[in-house]
């Protein structure tokens, strides 16, 4: 079984057939091990017994089909393999729809929520900080209205690519909807303003959409865990409010949410202008929306 698992990890297979009668198959535990080793591979269980309970359990563990040896014929085996592969692909498409934005390929709001929740849990145990960036495009509506929705969609895809390029592979870039994005930054070394400024800078460069060149900018709000909130909702709210302050103070800027005072109805932010990303301007008081 170990050799099989190593092969599954080393190469990509469309389908794997596990024979439960083999000495090293270890029963249905083999399905669980294979599922973890090759999550993209369809699994067919080959059994010497027609047992509905066993078959149901195998499907619950991640198999795509169960085939009794007494009923195997070449046409049936061929059909079972084709159907198992197609079922696996359908499952993958549905999972993709549930967790990723279909226009940009970025994580969606649900996936972002899950990852921020996990990251804050880990940071709480380790005593670390992390940052959540809320990004809103300035001027997107004008592009959409002037050049059409296809151009707007193309712009959003290019924005997504640029956001991915300016952060690390371990960071999460998500599209929240419309022209709003979020970025989860883990292990920021106390300087989330540096990657946030890179976001402002890259969005300030012009975009080429076919024969048209357009210019937009990005307003970025930064919420630092745990100072600006200790739940996903609190961090999103703080980052959103900081983004709003950056937008009303001139657009194409970033603002960092100051520590939340639980007994206060206001959130304080300090605004950092693009020309001086490491020199904060005086704090600005902002009422919670």
Question: Where does each model-flagged region fall?
Answer:
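Receiver (REC) domain switch/output surface
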Residues: 76-88, 115, 119, 242
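Alpha4 helix (beta4-alpha4-beta5 surface) of REC/receiver domains from two-component response regulators
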Residues: 28-29, 49-67, 71
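Cyclic nucleotide signaling catalytic output domains
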Residues: 68, 173, 198, 208, ...
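Amphipathic HAMP/coiled-coil signal-transducing linker helices
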Residues: 90-107, 121
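Short amphipathic alpha-helix used as the core "switch/output" element in two-component signaling
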Residues: 6, 28-40, 57
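Acidic, metal-coordinating helix/loop segments flanking the phosphotransfer/catalytic sites
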Residues: 1-15
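Conserved long alpha-helical elements within nucleotide-processing catalytic cores of c-di-GMP signaling
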Residues: 108-131, 138-168, 174-178, 182-186, ...
């Amino acid at each position: 079984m170990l050799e099989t698992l190593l092969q599954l990890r080393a190469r990509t297979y469309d389908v794997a057939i596990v024979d439960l009668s083999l000495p090293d198959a270890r029963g249905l535990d083999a399905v669980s091990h294979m599922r973890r080793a090759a999550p993209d591979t369809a699994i067919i269980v080959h059994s010497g017994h027609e047992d509905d309970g066993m078959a149901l359990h195998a499907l619950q563990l991640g198999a795509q089909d169960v085939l009794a040896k007494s009923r195997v014929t070449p046409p049936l085996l061929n059909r079972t393999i084709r159907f198992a592969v197609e079922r696996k692909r359908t499952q993958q498409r549905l999972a993709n729809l549930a967790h990723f934005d279909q226009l940009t390929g970025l994580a969606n709001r649900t996936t972002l929520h899950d990852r921020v929740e996990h990251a804050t849990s880990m940071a709480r145990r380790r005593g670390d900080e992390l940052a959540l960036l809320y990004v809103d495009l300035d001027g997107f509506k004008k592009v959409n209205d002037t050049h059409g929705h296809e151009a707007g969609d193309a712009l959003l895809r290019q924005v997504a690519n640029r956001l991915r390029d300016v952060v690390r592979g371990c960071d999460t870039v998500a599209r929240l909807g419309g022209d709003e994005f979020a970025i989860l930054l883990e292990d920021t070394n106390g300087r989330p303003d540096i990657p946030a400024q890179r976001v402002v800078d890259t969005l300030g460069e012009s975009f080429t959409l076919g024969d048209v060149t357009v210019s937009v900018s990005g307003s970025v709000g930064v919420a630092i865990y745990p100072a600006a909130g200790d739940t996903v909702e609190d961090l999103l709210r703080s980052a959103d409010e900081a983004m709003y302050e950056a937008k009303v103070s001139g657009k194409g800027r970033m603002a960092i949410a100051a520590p939340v005072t639980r007994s206060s109805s206001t959130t304080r932010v300090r605004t950092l202008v693009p020309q001086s990303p490491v020199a904060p301007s005086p704090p600005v008081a902002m009422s919670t929306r």
